[in-house]
Amino acid sequence: MEKLMEEKKTTLWQEIKICRVDETNYPHDLKKIKDRPEVLYYRGNIDILNEHKSIAVVGSRKISAVGAKLAYNAGSIIGKNGFNLVNGLALGCDAEALKGALAAGGKCAVVLPCGINEIYPKSNQWIAEEVLKQGGCLISEYPEGTRPEKYRFVQRDRLQSGMSQGVLVVEAMEKSGTMHTAEYAKKQNRRLACY
């Protein structure tokens, strides 16, 4: 039984797929932004981004207890209502929102600041595995083997907003990475809300 479980886990991580901007499964909303990537690398079901509306939920890594509850509840509401939850798998708000969406049976799209073969942060790998098990996807604009660098987090933020119809900020400092996502939402004419 243990061997079967390990094989099943390994299978989730085996195949990295590529989606070009001219392909039908490239996220339609992402096609509309000026600085879209020409190629996306992904695992899982990227089609969810064209089948259902998506909402990005982002916020502080160092989240308060109230913020954690709000992020979880926001994720749960998004999941229960048939929307995709999009974020970057970061500690704090991102992780709590993903947990809420997954617990509600929702689908999630995680945008990574590195190659798809590396989950960042490693402590959230179990969440990434749950995203795949529940029919979601992991996405990156970077090829396998690309390490997470500071500037790649900002680049990831534009994709989180770009593939969503709206961005919900739960908690954030004025000069935080979350504010990059909020700025991209404004530039990309996405709905922006604070919770």
Regions found by a protein language model. Give the residues of each.
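Glycine-biased, small-residue-rich flexible motifs in mid-sequence functional cores and linkers
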Residues: L12-Y195
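Long amphipathic alpha-helical segments
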Residues: M1-K8, I18
